[in-house]
Amino acid sequence: MDQDVLKKQVAEAALRFVPEGDIIGVGTGSTANFFIDALATLKDRIKGTVASSEATAERLKQHGIEVFSLNDVGSLSVYVDGADEVNQHREMIKGGGGALTREKIVAAMAKEFICIVDGSKQVNRLGAFPLPIEVIPMARSYVARKLVALGGQPQYREGFLTDNGNIILDVHNLDISNPIELETTLNNIVGVVTNGLFAKRPADIVLVGEKSGAVNQY
């Protein structure tokens, strides 16, 4: 089954977690885009959304779905987003699209985090996908040296700036045997805004679109 079909299928399955009359958080990326398209069918049943990126906000508005500033919202009942990798503990690597900081903020606000993926994103151990780290531009070289000292191989994502005006270092070959510990260690490096490990705040529910046509939940 085509990967886009799987993404569409799992995105539509996430609609059952959308409470009527609430403001919900919406993620960024290809699978999240399928969720936005599906959410448009329910737009009259929700109060609105909070977007984790400018691109997501634009797509929501194109569907006529209201987008609120997170600063105007006290809490979110649910946040729906994809992942680049997810393990059996529902810990994730996110940020392939560069929206990791805003995604992490919206996830922190949400009572329930629903992660939607196709089966190719499930892993036993995180780290085959390079770990994105958002960095203040002037700290790029300093942070890169610190990452090398931790055993990583940082690669500057050239020509890309986040919605916050920062740069991304994609780090290969990090030992992610303890995701919670590494998430904290990386965030303690001066100049790092945040990293793409979602371990301290993992997903509450993972929905997986399988090639068989089934959507599994764990």
UniProtKB/Swiss-Prot annotation:
GO terms for cellular component: cytosol. This is Ribose-5-phosphate isomerase A. It holds the Pfam family Rib_5-P_isom_A. One of its GO terms (biological process) is pentose-phosphate shunt, non-oxidative branch. Homodimer. Belongs to the ribose 5-phosphate isomerase family. Its EC number is 5.3.1.6. Catalyzes the reversible conversion of ribose-5-phosphate to ribulose 5-phosphate. The gene is rpiA. Pathway: Carbohydrate degradation; pentose phosphate pathway; D-ribose 5-phosphate from D-ribulose 5-phosphate (non-oxidative stage): step 1/1. Substrate binds at T28, G29, S30, T31, D81, G82, A83, D84, K94, G95, G96, G97, K121. It is an enzyme of class 5 (isomerase). It catalyses: aldehydo-D-ribose 5-phosphate = D-ribulose 5-phosphate. InterPro entries: NagB/RpiA_transferase-like, Ribose5P_isomerase_typA_subgr, Ribose5P_isomerase_type_A. GO terms for molecular function: ribose-5-phosphate isomerase activity. The active site is at E103. Keywords: Isomerase.
